[in-house]
Amino acid sequence: MRYDSICEAFFIERPNRFIAHVLLDGDEVVCHVKNTGRCRELLVPGARVVLSRGANPLRKTAYDLISVYKGERLVNMDSQSPNAIAAEYLPRLFPDLTSFRQEVAWGDSRFDFCGVKGGRSFYLEVKGVTLEQADRTYFPDAPTERGAKHLRELTKLQQSGTDAYVLFVIQMQDVLSLEANRRTDPAFADALLAARAAGVGVYAVDCLVTPDSVTAQSTVPVLFL
């Protein structure tokens, strides 16, 4: 996926989940943060960030904060990008894919994708990953009851005979592994273990991130601890 009208700035502060103050060409500017997660390890004062100018001139904020440099590594933190990346990546993940749809309801949940591959129906949920420590990535970065619920629903699907998958889209490149962040959310970690034991397919892919694009790159090992 690609972004239009990008520029770089320096992060100043984040007064709430939705906006950040940045220094752009010497001026302090308020921008929209396209991720309501904490991202405290990324958004530190002075960090270089990438902004994308919004297309609507009537918006309250002219820019979206989409990526941030953590050292030399550029991390995409747009919470809407993982689904777009996954849509581009699905034909590579499933070579026998024949069709898919997005945002499909099942039971009390809504899954990111439903499709057909090899003549069988499947459901797939996508999780975006931005938390990295020593080249290892973790999900989630904050407790997510919704995430654990999705895994339980995927487990039910798999047990009922329908193929179910979860895809972790790691919004950076050159990482060693992905694992559930048990310290932050033990319920999610347990749900992931149970899903895998039931036969749910668990995949992770890292991404080539540039200032104006994000593209799925290489499969990453998922560690179950």
Segments the model singles out, each with a brief description of its role:
Residues 16-21:
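Short aromatic-glycine-enriched beta-strand elements
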Residues 93-106:
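A short acidic/basic microdomain associated with nuclease active sites
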Residues 135-145, 155-184, 206:
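Nucleic-acid nuclease catalytic cores
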Residues 27-41:
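Beta-strand/loop nucleic-acid-binding surfaces
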